[in-house]
Curated annotation (Swiss-Prot):
Cofactor(s) this protein cannot do without: Mn(2+)
UniProt-listed PANTHER family: 37S RIBOSOMAL PROTEIN S26, MITOCHONDRIAL, SMALL RIBOSOMAL SUBUNIT PROTEIN MS42
Subunit structure: Homodimer.
Name this protein carries in UniProt: Superoxide dismutase [Mn]
Cross-referenced Pfam families: Sod_Fe_C, Sod_Fe_N
Cofactor annotation comment: Binds 1 Mn(2+) ion per subunit.
Gene3D superfamilies attached to this UniProt entry: Fe,Mn superoxide dismutase (SOD) domain (1.10.287.990), Iron/manganese superoxide dismutase, C-terminal domain (3.55.40.20)
Lineage of producing organism: Bacteria, Bacillati, Bacillota, Bacilli, Lactobacillales
A cellular-component GO term for this protein: cytoplasm
Protein's gene: sodA
Organism, scientific name: Streptococcus pyogenes serotype M1
Amino acid sequence: MAIILPELPYAYDALEPQFDAETMTLHHDKHHATYVANTNAALEKHPEIGENLEELLADVTKIPEDIRQTLINNGGGHLNHALFWELLSPEKQDVTPDVAQAIDDAFGSFDAFKEQFTAAATGRFGSGWAWLVVNKEGQLEITSTANQDTPISEGKKPILALDVWEHAYYLNYRNVRPNYIKAFFEIVNWKKVSELYQAAK
């Protein structure tokens, strides 16, 4: 067995105009595919550890040292992107009532949440991700990680993810990351967010 690159759940151009087809093609077929290939190459060196990336990245000390950083970077990259694709929707969706209530409880209002999430995504220096997670106490929390680090390694369960690596937006938005973040909120798959939230609580 090996880690497989998942197909996108929609066409490459399905998220236009927010996310253009060229970016989606490069992002999925090149960047994500490379993370998968590098992950498989690392796992082949240590077949004894298995292939459950969520379990491995939940406690990175259990990963053999010679492949640890490779798996943090590439295994994390695979998990992060596999989740990211599912969190995007070609059809505009309203926030589900359960998630809306949880966001109100945690942040005061949806606008306040959006502001804090945008700040986390804008403020991430260099490459990384912005996240809405369910923390160990079962509460919603906004966080960001560098590179391809995953909140799973901190015992948190991601329910919304935004890739802020330049390869995710530079062709369309150049260096204006805030415009990319604004576009992201127009294509969030809130049904998937709700599904993840219910499973994580």
